[in-house]
Amino acid sequence: MSLLTEVETPTRNGWECKCSDSSDPLVIAASIIGILHLILWILDRLFFRCVYRRLKYGLKRGPSTEGVPESMREEYRQEQQSAVDVDDGHFVNIELE
């Protein structure tokens, strides 16, 4: 028994598709969906950092400060910056002899 399928058979001119119902709407729809899926997958792999960062953080850079006094905004900025700053006192230098 041959390992070849009924659809693909070798001929003298190379591989040839012998699909009798290639104009079937289901086959056409499946082909279109397959091509679209491939295109979307390629775009996802190319731009995944941009896409997922936008989904994670949204369009805004942070919480809305609308209606908040300027003094509270500055206090919030300082808190955020101090949370980001690295405190060198937490690190221990180990010297090997």
From Swiss-Prot:
Principal subcellular localization: virion
Activity regulation (record text): The M2 protein from most influenza A strains is inhibited by amantadine and rimantadine, resulting in viral uncoating incapacity. Emergence of amantadine-resistant variants is usually rapid.
Protein name, entry field: Matrix protein 2
Stretches for region Disordered: 60-83
Remaining remarks: When the channel is activated, one or more imidazole moieties of His-37 probably become bi-protonated.
Lipidation (S-palmitoyl cysteine): C50
Native organism taxonomy: Viruses, Riboviria, Orthornavirae, Negarnaviricota, Polyploviricotina
Source organism of this protein record: Influenza A virus (strain A/Turkey/Ireland/1378/1983 H5N8)
Gene this protein is translated from: M
Record remark: domains: Cytoplasmic tail plays an important role in virion assembly and morphogenesis.
Listed Gene3D superfamilies: 6.10.250.1640
Keywords: Disulfide bond, Host cell membrane, Host membrane, Host-virus interaction, Hydrogen ion transport, Inhibition of host autophagy by virus, Ion channel, Ion transport, Lipoprotein, Membrane, Palmitate, Phosphoprotein, Signal-anchor, Transmembrane, Transmembrane helix, Transport, Viral ion channel, Virion
Sequence intervals crossing the membrane: 23-43
GO biological process: protein complex oligomerization; symbiont genome entry into host cell via pore formation in plasma membrane; symbiont-mediated suppression of host autophagy
Phosphoserine: modified positions: S64, S82
Virion surface side: 1-22
